[in-house]
């Protein structure tokens, strides 16, 4: 017998509750400028894709599309080939190359903060190199690019969108949905952000309002 809980009134359910009073705890809020050095993870989070063992070892930070797997392993192949070639300096010291794959923006932050400094840095494009140098990163431009890399937007062949502007307008009109990478760490996302901002803040806001989160 007796009523099931589904038949009980709200007041009857309240009567079953045990209430304890606790001392309110204030949250800690800091208005200090974030410490970039402290916020960055230890470099071990990004292990070496190629580890050189020469008397002189040159470490290069690279974006993932040059140090990944299969078709994205170009720089890894180059480094392994170099390391196997027996290059030596005039005084007989062996020279090797180490490759570490780090997202372009994160790599720039390591350089700006001084938390970890590679000998060479090849981001997805020059934007992050300029970003690092403009924020007091200790860099000198050796070459505009190491290998060609073109940014683009992929759509279905029969979509009718033939330019980036067409695709952006379609997103703004809520006809298609698009995702993009974090512009603070990825050159792809940064390219798109700058493309949108070329036509003003309203253009970016209208686009971003239709981006799923």
For the regions a language model picked out, list residue spans one by one:
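Intrinsic-disorder/low-complexity, polar/charged segments
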Residues: 125, 186, 209-213
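N-terminal segment of the mature folded domain
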Residues: 3-185
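Bilobed "Venus flytrap"/periplasmic-binding protein-like clamshell domains
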Residues: 182-202
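Generic detector of well-ordered alpha-helical segments enriched in charged/polar residues
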Residues: 108, 168, 193, 205-208
